[in-house]
C-alpha cells in the first residue's frame, strides 16, 4: 500500500469499537529497492515499538491500561504506518476483553497479520510500571565535537575511515539525528548508536553525515537502514550495528535496530527525550 493512502495527514475519525482493519501496512520493498537491496538482506534486526496509550474495558466495564511493546522483525515484508497503529490501538478503548492475555493475543494476531511476520508483544501492567527503565544510549558522544557543517541531505561522501590502519572496536552515539515524515513533513527526532569493528571511522565526518539527514524525508526504519548501508559501503567495517531511538508521537515511539552479526537485542530503555 502507498503511504499517501494511509491516514497520515487526513482528518481523523476515532473508532468506537475495536477494529483490526485500521492497521495500514506499507511494504518495505520500495524503500529497500532505492537502497539497492533487491535480494537477500545485508542485515537483520528488529523494530521496537512502544505504545503508551493502550486501554480497554474489563468484563465489569472498568478501564484497564498497559504499556505495550512490539518487536517487529526486520525481515517482515511490511511495516505499519504509525497513525494507523495509533488509531488501531485507540479502538480498544471502549471494547471489553476478559483478560490482559486476551488483549495481548489480539494485538499479536493483528499486528503480525499486518506486518506479514510473527510479531512479539509484551504488555506491562500498572503494578510493574516502576520496573520500566530510562537510560541514555551507551557510547562515546559525537556531539562533543565542535565543527562546521552545511549539508542537510544525506551525503555518504562525508563518511571516511582509516583503511590502512589497524582495525578498532568503537561504540559511538549522537542525539542530533533528525529526519522528516515523508507524508506529513513533520520532523522526527532521534538518538543513534553505532557499534562497529573495522577501520576507524572519522568521527567528524560521521557526525556531519548524521546531521545531513536533517532535511531528509523517510520513515524511521528506512533512515536507519540507509545509515547502516552507507556506513557499511563507505567504511567497510567487519561488524556493524545501528540502533536509533526516536521520540514519541501519538503515544508511540519507534526504535529500529540493524546489525550484520549476532549479538543480544539492545535494551528497550527510554531515553530522556522519550
UniProtKB/Swiss-Prot annotation:
| Gene name tied to this protein | queF
Q: What does this protein do?
A: Catalyzes the NADPH-dependent reduction of 7-cyano-7-deazaguanine (preQ0) to 7-aminomethyl-7-deazaguanine (preQ1).
What are the protein's UniProt keywords? Cytoplasm, NADP, Oxidoreductase, Queuosine biosynthesis
Q: Does the keyword Cytoplasm apply?
A: yes
What protein name does the entry list?
NADPH-dependent 7-cyano-7-deazaguanine reductase
A GO MF annotation of the entry reads: preQ1 synthase activity
* Top enzyme class: oxidoreductase
**Pathway, per record:** tRNA modification; tRNA-queuosine biosynthesis
Amino acid at each position: 500500500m502507498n503511504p499517501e493512502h494511509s491516514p497520515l495527514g487526513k482528518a481523523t475519525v476515532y473508532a468506537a469499537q475495536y477494529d483490526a482493519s485500521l492497521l495500514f501496512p506499507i511494504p518495505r520493498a520500495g524503500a529497500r529497492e532505492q537502497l539497492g537491496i533487491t535480494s537477500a538482506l545485508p542485515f537483520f534486526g528488529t523494530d521496537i515499538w512502544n505504545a503508551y496509550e493502550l486501554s480497554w474495558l474489563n468484563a465489569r466495564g472498568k478501564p484497564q491500561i498497559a504499556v505495550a511493546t512490539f518487536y517487529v522483525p526486520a525481515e517482515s515484508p511490511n511495516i505499519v504506518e504509525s497513525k494507523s497503529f495509533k488509531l488501531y490501538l485507540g479502538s480498544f478503548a471502549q471494547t471489553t476483553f476478559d483478560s490482559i492475555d486476551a488483549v495481548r493475543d489480539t494485538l499479536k494476531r493483528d499486528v503480525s497479520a499486518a506486518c506479514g511476520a510473527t510479531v512479539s508483544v509484551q504488555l506491562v501492567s500498572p503494578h510493574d510500571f516502576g520496573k520500566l527503565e530510562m537510560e541514555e544510549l551507551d557510547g562515546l558522544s559525537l556531539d562533543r565535537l565542535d565543527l562546521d557543517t552545511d549539508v542537510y541531505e544525506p551525503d555518504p561522501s562525508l563518511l571516511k575511515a582509516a583503511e590502512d590502519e589497524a582495525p578498532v572496536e568503537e561504540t559511538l552515539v549522537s542525539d542530533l539525528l533528525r529526519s522528516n515524515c515523508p507524508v506529513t513533513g513533520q520532523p522526527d527526532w532521534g538518538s543513534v548508536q553505532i557499534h562497529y569493528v573495522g577501520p576507524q571511522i572519522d568521527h567528524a565526518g560521521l557526525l556531519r553525515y548524521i546531521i545531513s539527514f536533517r532535511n531528509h524525508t523517510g520513515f524511521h526504519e528506512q533512515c536507519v537502514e540507509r545509515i547502516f548501508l552507507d556506513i557499511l559501503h563507505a567504511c567497510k567495517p567487519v561488524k556493524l550495528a545501528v540502533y536509533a531511538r526516536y521520540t514519541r508521537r501519538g503515544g508511540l515511539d519507534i526504535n529500529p535496530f540493524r546489525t550484520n552479526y549476532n549479538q543480544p537485542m539492545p535494551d528497550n530503555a527510554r531515553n530522556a527525550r522519550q
